[in-house]
Amino acid sequence: MPQSPFFFPDTTVLINMALLGYVDHLRAFVQGRGRWCSTIAWEWRRSRDELSLHSADAAVRATCGEVLDPQDREHIDIEALLTSMREPGDPPNKHRGEAETLVIISNRADLFGRLRDKTRHRGTGRRG
């Protein structure tokens, strides 16, 4: 179990820090504990190219560290969470990065140890 939890920045954080030139500040804050899921890494690459943020790419990759891919069983939970997050008319992949990150964090004890609300029923806020 890690001494301190990993930090999972989302794409918006990465873009904003890159636009402001503050990725090094984020890296100092994360202190080597950065991680990102494959969808967030893909979203970063797409945004990097669209917004011409290539100069920040190496720092973002160093900040985020290892890319974590969903395991087979996690894909089912990701799709279920995506379904609950989507609004009518949303593109199919809207919120995929958030859903993937949440599922990976909640399913992998090695990232945060035992999560207190792991027994919480999805979408109800109830335990049990």
Give the predicted meaning of each segment.
Residues 2-111, 118-128:
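Active-site-proximal, substrate-binding regions of enzyme catalytic domains
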